[in-house]
């Protein structure tokens, strides 16, 4: 059976690894969770043992749901007497997206109404509603007009361990705490005799979770006690009892062997008292030493190796003071220089303030707050005085300040639209003339890469000044984003030798996977001038994907096929991708395969797009045409978009099905559309403003775009 295990964003790949370790043969990371496949007993084992999951959702039905009446009818059609008894209590959680049903509470209420009405149809009493502790919790996911109904096997969020009492300010959810511990490699270090330290421990969440992890205590034991987590009629009570019995045996052995190698301190006595009380309830107080101390007075533990895990203050209620982060970094370098640190910082600027060199950085979310998790191993870099912060030159500091300003400006937009690849800087300071694009890896090590494109400097600028400014810009970018040199690609936008538009740069042949508009994509940041993903077209691709459901999609001059892939993921009936380059078509094929989009409905055509259009007789509902400005391939006629626009657009419009739309775009800055001639065969309107994202507003001429429809 296929089922879904949800988690906080940023934990997906850790969760997939955890589920594999729990015995699942198929566990594939996706947005905010993992698509799993296994038996009910395995799903119940996840409820008991997962430290990272939020919910385990066991499907009971799925159906097309174009509107609220279809939702009600689909739910009412189910035999609910097979899932819940009249005397039981019920709760419904709903997650909706789309333009037909937009309110989750309304959807949940309609589901409750349908369940109650179906029970009455069966001559049964209606079950009561209990949103806090229901006997059965039903979950709805409504996406792209399709409703999926599941039983929440855990009965609620699995981050609750059952030990938390008095919570101090800004408590960390336990499953996020587990992620910090796993990124710190705490299980490995504990097995090797290492210690665990949190110098700003608050109410003790990280240390208590670390102690339970070290003692092999199942997260679900205290949460559920002796009762099953759900009274759903399909729940396997015998399997749960066996899982519970095994967990109790492992808990007894683990707690008996747990040694006092865990250290926590905080300047707030109230926090220390809350931490001690929580540790007592969790049964691990004997393993944790809590002390009241300022971070500046941090003492060195007796263990030679170990992990530091810390969640310094950064939310709106607790002022995020860079000086506090600097004090934390200095204290760690002095007390535990050879340990490994996993620090959850509020943002890149605060991570930079620690003065620590991060080997890896991950994007995570503490509730709605986007955070930067930095991994430092070792904490202190040999040969560097920990008391001396890395200083930037005056020019580099200007660039760094502008980058931080831009990141702050983009933060809410990026969170709202799930943007992980974007332009952070575009010659904002004229003397530092370059574009800096950020690519956040999806999966793998979840590294952050920078793609820096330096614009050609005027001949009057001395070469020494060009080199100095380039180095200052790179230094600022690396500091702000906390990336090592090998994750920075530096290129010049000058014309290649021999007039070639695309010159070969490094020979790394290194692809990373990123995500845009719900699609996974391969990019190559080092080998070519362009990366395989034109970031400026992001809004236009999203627009087309939103229209693609059940449609026939044609992508002319398709490049690496990103628009085709996103249309396929969005539910296009078919995609046709045309390009003269076999390299790009293979790239497109790989991108489709990466998203599980194969089959004859996704056609790849190696051909000159102009010639192919003249011979094709197919009809398409959505066409994307993004031609190059110039092309002089040996296998096709020379192409000039200004000269060939009428021929190209006439042929493309002729392939539109009734009601179809053609999106035409190009980045030739001196391009002039022949509007009067086009008006003879198409309705045409410019939509450029709708296709420029916030990160390209500084360079609104990056491209232009039009929407064309057949006359009549």
UniProtKB/Swiss-Prot annotation:
Its EC number is 2.1.1.173, 2.1.1.264. InterPro entries: 23SrRNA_methyltr_KL, DNA_methylase_N6_adenine_CS, RlmKL-like_Mtase, RlmKL-like_Mtase_CS, RlmL_1st, SAM-dep_methyl-trfase, SAM-dependent_MTases_sf, THUMP_dom. Pfam families: Methyltrans_SAM, RlmL_1st, THUMP, UPF0020. It catalyses: guanosine(2445) in 23S rRNA + S-adenosyl-L-methionine = N(2)-methylguanosine(2445) in 23S rRNA + S-adenosyl-L-homocysteine + H(+); guanosine(2069) in 23S rRNA + S-adenosyl-L-methionine = N(2)-methylguanosine(2069) in 23S rRNA + S-adenosyl-L-homocysteine + H(+). Transmembrane segments: none annotated. The keyword Transport does not apply. It is found in: Cytoplasm. GO terms for molecular function: 23S rRNA (guanine(2445)-N(2))-methyltransferase activity; RNA binding; rRNA (guanine-N7-)-methyltransferase activity. Signal peptide: none annotated. The keyword Aminoacyl-tRNA synthetase does not apply. Keywords: Cytoplasm, Methyltransferase, RNA-binding, rRNA processing, S-adenosyl-L-methionine, Transferase. Residues 42-153 form the THUMP domain. One of its GO terms (cellular component) is cytoplasm. It comes from the Bacteria. Disulfide bonds: none annotated. SUPFAM superfamilies: S-adenosyl-L-methionine-dependent methyltransferases. Belongs to the methyltransferase superfamily. RlmKL family. Specifically methylates the guanine in position 2445 (m2G2445) and the guanine in position 2069 (m7G2069) of 23S rRNA. This is Ribosomal RNA large subunit methyltransferase K/L. It comes from Stenotrophomonas maltophilia (strain R551-3). The gene is rlmL.
């Amino acid at each position: 059976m296929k089922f879904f295990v949800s988690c906080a964003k940023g934990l997906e790949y850790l969760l997939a690894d955890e589920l594999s370790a729990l015995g699942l043969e198929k566990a594939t990371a996706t947005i905010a969770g993992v698509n799993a496949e296994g038996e009910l007993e395995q799903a119940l084992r996840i409820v008991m043992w997962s430290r990272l999951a939020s919910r385990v959702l066991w499907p009971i039905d799925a159906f097309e749901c174009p509107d609220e009446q279809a939702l009600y009818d689909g739910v009412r059609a189910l035999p609910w007497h097979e899932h819940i008894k009249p005397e039981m209590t019920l709760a419904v959680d709903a997650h909706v997206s789309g333009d037909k049903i937009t309110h989750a509470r309304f959807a949940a209420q309609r589901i409750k109404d349908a369940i109650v009405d179906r029970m009455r149809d069966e001559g049964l009493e209606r079950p009561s509603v209990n949103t806090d502790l229901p006997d059965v919790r039903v979950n709805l996911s409504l996406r792209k007009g399709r409703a999926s109904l599941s039983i929440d096997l855990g009965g609620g969020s699995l981050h609750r361990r059952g030990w938390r009492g008095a919570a101090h300010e800004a408590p960390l959810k336990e499953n996020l705490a587990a992620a910090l511990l796993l990124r710190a490699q705490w299980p490995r270090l504990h097995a090797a005799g290492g210690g665990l330290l949190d110098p700003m421990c608050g109410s003790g969440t990280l240390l208590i979770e670390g102690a339970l992890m070290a003692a092999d205590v199942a997260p679900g034991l205290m949460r559920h006690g002796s009762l099953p987590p759900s009274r759903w009629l399909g729940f396997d009570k015998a399997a749960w009892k066996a899982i519970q019995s095994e967990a109790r045996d492992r808990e007894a052995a683990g707690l008996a062997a747990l040694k006092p190698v865990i250290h926590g301190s905080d300047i707030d006595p109230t926090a220390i008292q809350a931490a001690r009380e929580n540790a007592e309830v969790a049964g691990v107080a004997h393993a944790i030493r809590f002390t009241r101390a300022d971070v500046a007075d941090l003492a060195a533990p007796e263990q030679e190796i170990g992990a530091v895990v810390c969640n310094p203050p950064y939310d709106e209620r607790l002022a995020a003071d860079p000086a506090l982060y600097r004090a934390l970094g200095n204290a760690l370098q002095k007390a535990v220089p050879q340990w490994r640190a996993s620090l959850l910082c509020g943002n890149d600027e605060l991570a930079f303030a620690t003065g620590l060199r991060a080997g890896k950085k991950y994007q995570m979310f503490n509730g709605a707050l986007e955070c930067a998790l930095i991994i430092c191993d070792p904490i202190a870099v040999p040969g560097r005085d920990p008391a001396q912060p890395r200083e930037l030159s005056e020019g580099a500091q200007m660039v760094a300040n502008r980058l931080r300003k831009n990141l702050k400006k983009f933060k809410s937009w990026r969170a709202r639209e799930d943007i992980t690849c974007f332009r952070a800087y575009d010659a904002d300071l004229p003397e530092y003339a370059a574009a800096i694009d950020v690519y956040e890896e999806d999966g793998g090590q979840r590294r952050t890469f920078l793609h820096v494109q330096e614009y050609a400097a005027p001949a009057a600028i001395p070469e020494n000044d060009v080199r100095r400014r380039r180095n200052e810009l790179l230094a600022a970018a690396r500091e702000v984003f906390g990336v090592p040199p090998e994750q920075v690609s530096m290129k010049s936008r000058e014309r290649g030798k021999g007039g070639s538009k695309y010159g070969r740069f490094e020979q790394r042949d290194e692809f990373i996977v990123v995500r845009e508009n719900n699609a996974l994509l391969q990019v190559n940041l080092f080998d070519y001038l362009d990366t395989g993903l034109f970031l400026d077209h992001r809004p236009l691709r999203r627009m087309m994907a939103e229209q693609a459901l059940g449609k026939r999609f044609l992508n002319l001059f398709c490049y690496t096929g990103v628009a085709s892939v996103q249309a396929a993921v969005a539910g296009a009936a078919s995609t046709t991708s045309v390009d003269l380059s076999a390299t790009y078509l293979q790239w497109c094929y790989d991108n489709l395969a990466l998203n599980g989009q194969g089959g004859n409905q996704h056609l790849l055509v190696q051909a000159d797009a102009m010639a192919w259009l003249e011979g094709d007789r197919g009809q398409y509902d959505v066409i994307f045409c993004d031609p190059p400005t110039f092309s002089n391939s040996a296998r096709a006629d020379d192409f000039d978009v200004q000269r060939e626009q009428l021929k190209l657009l006439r042929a493309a419009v002729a392939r539109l099905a009734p009601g179809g739309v053609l999106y035409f775009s190009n980045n030739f800055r001196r391009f002039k559309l022949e509007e009067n001639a086009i008006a003879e065969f198409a309705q045409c309107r410019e939509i450029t403003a709708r296709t420029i994202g916030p990160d390209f507003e500084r360079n609104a001429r990056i491209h232009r775009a039009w929407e064309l429809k057949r006359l009549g």
